[in-house]
């Protein structure tokens, strides 16, 4: 409803209420006082017989008579009984008899005037209830209704052409849309329409965008709702809303129902703490029944999205409810290149902006990250009063997205600046001289976020996609993390070592313990996984992880972790000691320029015959 229509509706309602109030006031407070005197029937007959009355006006139904007042005042009113001798008495005494004609208009007017106020009150109450039912402030009569947004002719302004970098997921949903448009081509071969598609992937990979594209392409009614909109504070509301949603969907079949963040209502049953669990389970049970229960729902396709498939109930995940599970993962290099092309539309880019280079520098970025990256670059260009976005703004935006904005107003003393420079130079130098490790992308001692300085590495595309990390890579990772702490020890002495490496030490301890207890990379303990990994209690898992090893094994684990950390420490220290001159030069450049990129670092290493780290 438009704002003008809503305005006129409210004005009409207020006018109706004003009329009701005025009518009640006029009926109860402005009623005229009764000034006509009455005369009893006996006195009336006596006066007629005494020849004191010469004229009488009878009503049409002969129930009342009006008698002239001798004093000249208003006539007397006489209520007449059913007396058949009355006319004879009047004629015997020569009384002039006049009968008032019967008026139909007066009869209907009396009926209308009698019913006017009750009808007006009923109409006013009806409109008040209608407004309370549809208004945003009071939902007392609408709790059981579904809150799904319905688009009979989808106008999301998003098509599959706007979705890039996730071709496999797009193919799966394109087939679903094709099934809705050309069902005969599939049914002739005996194929059945899939009942549900579950989109699974990390946040920001484009799951909701895919659903919008389906709405834009399908040409069928599209219902969209969030999983959190089912359950309210009242018992039974969630199940009622599920029923209402599917009743609307069945009435508009074929159609698509999109449930975003389905993990809010589809979590595992029978686990967790708290009193709200039963209501959520009741809602989930109703959802399971509607999706594939005793009654079918032919023509309704459920598309759901979640980034927590591990907490979903197994009954919800089975074929027949969600026939397809589409993984929407982080895009690879080619996917990032396509996504950057899509988000670069409408932005004025300089000639030096290389989208290929940006795509290579951003492994692990999702579609939302890349969109935010170009938007931050555009904001920086506008802040600097530029007419186009250059590569400098893009580079600054990458740093801003990864580590937060620069803290240019923070003044660093020369001593602290030198300390941070050596710390970051230690990380970078060890990383650059470790065999088969991620290349250094950038070194900076400009404070960002909670960090005093940062060293960026470009992760390997293959390692990120496969999730497979070798033993040598993990050992190199620990050595690189220890490089900053060791550089402080070499330059300033063990007594001047700071707490700046606390996060690095936590990372080293975590990697070493995982190598021993999860990955079986301990020579002493062998290829075994120790310690049963359990999830949180609210995710439907055990309250605590079980310890499935003895105290002696725990002591051996601690010894192995300490040995791995010590080996990484010795390797990193050897690299920095053998390349002490390069370490000093790199720190001096950082103090002077505050930022060193990968090209400058490679030039420095090549000109000084850097010595690589020894293999383990």
Swiss-Prot record:
Quaternary state and interactors: Homohexamer (Potential). Part of a large complex that includes FtsH2 and PSII. Coimmunoprecipitates with YidC.
Compartment(s): Cellular thylakoid membrane
Gene that produces this protein: ftsH3
Protein name (record): ATP-dependent zinc metalloprotease FtsH 3
Binding site for Zn(2+): 423, 427, 504
Active site residues per record: 424
GO CC field: plasma membrane-derived thylakoid membrane
InterPro entries reported in the protein's UniProt record: AAA+_ATPase, AAA_lid_3, ATPase_AAA_core, ATPase_AAA_CS, FtsH, P-loop_NTPase, Pept_M41_FtsH_extracell, Peptidase_M41
Alphabetically ordered keywords of this record: ATP-binding, Hydrolase, Membrane, Metal-binding, Metalloprotease, Nucleotide-binding, Protease, Thylakoid, Transmembrane, Transmembrane helix, Zinc
Membrane topology listed for this record: Multi-pass membrane protein
Cofactor: binding comment: Binds 1 zinc ion per subunit.
Stored SMART domains: AAA (SM00382)
Family affiliation: In the central section; belongs to the AAA ATPase family. In the C-terminal section; belongs to the peptidase M41 family.
Lumenal compartment spans: 31-108
A GO molecular-function annotation: ATP-dependent peptidase activity
Binding, ATP: 201-208
């Amino acid at each position: 409803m438009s704002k003008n229509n809503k305005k006129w509706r409210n004005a009409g309602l207020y006018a109706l209420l004003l009329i009701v109030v005025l009518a009640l006031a006029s009926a109860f407070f402005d009623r005229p006082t009764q000034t006509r005197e009455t005369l009893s029937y006996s006195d009336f007959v006596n006066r007629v017989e005494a020849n004191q009355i010469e004229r009488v006006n009878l009503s049409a139904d002969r129930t009342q008579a009006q008698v002239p007042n001798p004093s000249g005042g208003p006539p007397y009113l006489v209520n007449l009984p059913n007396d058949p001798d009355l006319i004879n008495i009047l004629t015997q005494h020569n009384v002039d008899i006049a009968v008032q004609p019967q008026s139909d208009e007066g009869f209907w007017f009396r009926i209308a005037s009698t019913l006017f106020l009750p009808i007006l009150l009923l109409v006013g109450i009806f409109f008040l209830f209608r407004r309370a039912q549809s208004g945003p402030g009071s939902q007392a009569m609408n709790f059981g209704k579904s809150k799904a947004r319905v688009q009979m002719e989808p106008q999301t302004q998003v098509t599959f052409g706007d979705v890039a970098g996730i071709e496999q997921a797009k193919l799966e949903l394109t087939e679903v849309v094709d099934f809705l448009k050309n069902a005969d081509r599939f049914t002739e071969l005996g194929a059945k329409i899939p009942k549900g598609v579950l989109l699974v992937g990390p946040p920001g990979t484009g799951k909701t965008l895919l659903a919008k594209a389906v709405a834009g392409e399908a040409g069928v009614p599209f219902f969209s709702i969030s999983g959190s909109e089912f359950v309210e504070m009242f018992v039974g509301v969630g199940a009622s809303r599920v029923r209402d949603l599917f009743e609307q969907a069945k009435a508009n079949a074929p159609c698509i129902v999109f449930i975003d963040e389905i993990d809010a209502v589809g979590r595992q049953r029978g686990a967790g703490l708290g009193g709200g669990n039963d209501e959520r389970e009741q809602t989930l049970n109703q959802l399971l029944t509607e999706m594939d229960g005793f009654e079918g729902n032919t023509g309704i396709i459920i598309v759901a999205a979640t980034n927590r498939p591990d907490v979903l109930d197994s009954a919800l995940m089975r074929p027949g409810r969600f026939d397809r599970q589409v993984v929407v993962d982080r895009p690879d290099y080619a996917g990032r290149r396509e996504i950057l092309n899509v988000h670069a539309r409408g932005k004025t880019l300089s000639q030096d902006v290389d989208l290929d280079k940006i795509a290579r520098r951003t492994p692990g970025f999702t579609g939302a990250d890349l969109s935010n990256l170009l938007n931050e670059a555009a904001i920086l260009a506008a802040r600097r009063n530029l007419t186009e976005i250059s590569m400098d703004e893009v580079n600054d935006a990458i740093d801003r997205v990864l580590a937060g904005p620069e803290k240019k107003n923070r003044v660093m003393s020369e001593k602290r600046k030198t300390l941070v420079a050596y710390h970051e130079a230690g990380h970078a130098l060890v990383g650059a001289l470790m065999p088969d490790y991620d290349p250094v992308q950038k070194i900076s001692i400009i404070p960002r976020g909670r960090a005093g300085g940062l060293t960026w590495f470009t992760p390997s595309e293959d390692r990120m996609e496969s999730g497979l990390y070798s033993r040598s890579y993990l050992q190199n990772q620990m050595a690189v993390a220890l490089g900053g702490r060791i550089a402080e020890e070499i330059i300033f002495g063990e007594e001047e070592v700071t707490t700046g490496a606390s996060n690095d030490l936590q990372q080293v301890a975590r990697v070493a313990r995982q190598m021993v207890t999860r990955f079986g990379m301990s020579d002493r303990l062998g290829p075994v996984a120790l310690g049963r990994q359990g999830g949180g209690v609210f995710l439907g898992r055990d309250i605590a992880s079980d310890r499935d090893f003895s105290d002696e094994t725990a002591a051996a684990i601690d010894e192995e972790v300490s040995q791995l950390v010590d080996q990484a420490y010795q390797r990193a220290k050897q690299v920095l000691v053998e390349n002490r001159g390069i370490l000093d030069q790199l720190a001096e450049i950082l103090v002077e320029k505050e930022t060193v990129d990968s090209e400058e670092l490679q030039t420095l290493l090549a000109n000084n015959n850097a010595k690589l780290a020894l293999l383990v």
